[in-house]
Amino acid sequence: MVSRMVSTMLSGLLFWLASGWTPAFAYSPRTPDRVSEADIQRLLHGVMEQLGIARPRVEYPAHQAMNLVGPQSIEGGAHEGLQHLGPFGNIPNIVAELTGDNIPKDFSEDQGYPDPPNPCPVGKTDDGCLENTPDTAEFSREFQLHQHLFDPEHDYPGLGKWNKKLLYEKMKGGERRKRRSVNPYLQGQRLDNVVAKKSVPHFSDEDKDPE
């Protein structure tokens, strides 16, 4: 019985479209001479709602948004599996893998890290990645400074590959750079003929006029 009603209504709809008739509730002022796809979708959605096939939408006005109580959740975000979008669920989504322009999709054995990060990723401990290093900002600054000054070809000619362990050993064995807490430009005798901006001029006793 239901299938007969659906076929009857669909045949009537096709007859309307073939005859060029436009229903009053599906009238579009932009295209008065032809029926748009949005009008067809609205008409089909109305038919499906009347037959109980489609679930009607529940929309809340803006002034009722603050009246919602209890936990609310939103479904259908990215990477939540295969979804069907659109008012009728006939638009399948595409689950794309998020990768950068220079980032390969898989890190196989032939695609190693040229400069492995810390802490070590899984399976990359033997590539020069450090495991037992201080997790402080000061060590990170010092390590990056030595990393730019480190020349493996000059310091270690037999080393054909970058190695963080040698740099770490060099940092622990060498003298630490002392921070300069005294401004060297403020030491020594001050010149009297140099006057700072917006300062009170100072005159020595020799420049005073004899009374």
Swiss-Prot record:
Proteolytically cleaved in the Golgi by a furin-like convertase to generate bioactive peptides. The modification Phosphoserine is found at S140, S204. Residues 106-132, 173-211 are annotated as: Disordered. Pfam families: Secretogranin_V (PF05281). Keywords: Chaperone, Cleavage on pair of basic residues, Disulfide bond, Neuropeptide, Phosphoprotein, Secreted, Signal, Sulfation, Transport. Belongs to the 7B2 family. Acts as a molecular chaperone for PCSK2/PC2, preventing its premature activation in the regulated secretory pathway. Binds to inactive PCSK2 in the endoplasmic reticulum and facilitates its transport from there to later compartments of the secretory pathway where it is proteolytically matured and activated. Also required for cleavage of PCSK2 but does not appear to be involved in its folding. Plays a role in regulating pituitary hormone secretion. The C-terminal peptide inhibits PCSK2 in vitro. This is Neuroendocrine protein 7B2. The gene is SCG5.
